[in-house]
Amino acid sequence: HMIDVDGGIGTMLVIASKGRREMPNAHAYVDGQLEQLSRSGQFVGQHICTPKLGVAVHINAFNFPVWGMLEKMAPALLAGMPVIVKPATATCQVTELAFQMIIASRLLPAGAVQLITGDLGNLLDHLGGQDVVSFTGSEATGRHLRTHPALIQNAVHFMAEQDSLNASVLGADVAVGSAEFDLFVKEVHREITVKAGQKCTA
């Protein structure tokens, strides 16, 4: 779907541009100014961002097979982390086509990105504190992953975007038939019908 592909490429370009403009060409960068941590000024601190030494495992949803991959891949690569992409089985062929184009471009070092279209097997058992798991999908699967013994025991950083329940709020001062009301109805209709409403903003 054009929204999926164009949105994914657009998101990736925004992240890459932000990295090019705002981050140094280095393995670490200083985030913010020196801050006083004690009343006397004897203790000060400053955030220094460095990449984790592990891998980013991205378990993605079915409804945006390209966008989901690219929007997670871009910041991970920018942070210096290799990526393992695990797309949803239902749409993994679409993800694989886009992935093969990335590999064929030879823009990334060999092994910087990998794709698993089947079962993860025992991959999660081998992750540690320098690794990251990012999941998009159902609340039930998110709960299952979040409570995986190896992720807990090894303090693996886990992020989840799960079943979205979104509200659409229209101000009480908006009158039926006004341009604002008509736009609101049009946008709500679009959100619940595009991709059968199966997207995070529906």
Predicted regions and their residues:
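A structured beta-alpha segment of the ubiquitous adenosine-cofactor-binding alpha/beta core
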Residues: 43-46, 113-134
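N-terminal Rossmann-like NAD(P)+-binding subdomain of aldehyde/semialdehyde dehydrogenases
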Residues: 1-41, 88
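ALDH superfamily catalytic-core signature
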Residues: 104-106, 129-132, 140-202
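Short acidic capping loops at alpha-helix termini that bridge into adjacent secondary structure
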Residues: 54-55, 109-113
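Hydrophobic residues in well-ordered beta-strands that form the structural core
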Residues: 85, 117, 160-162
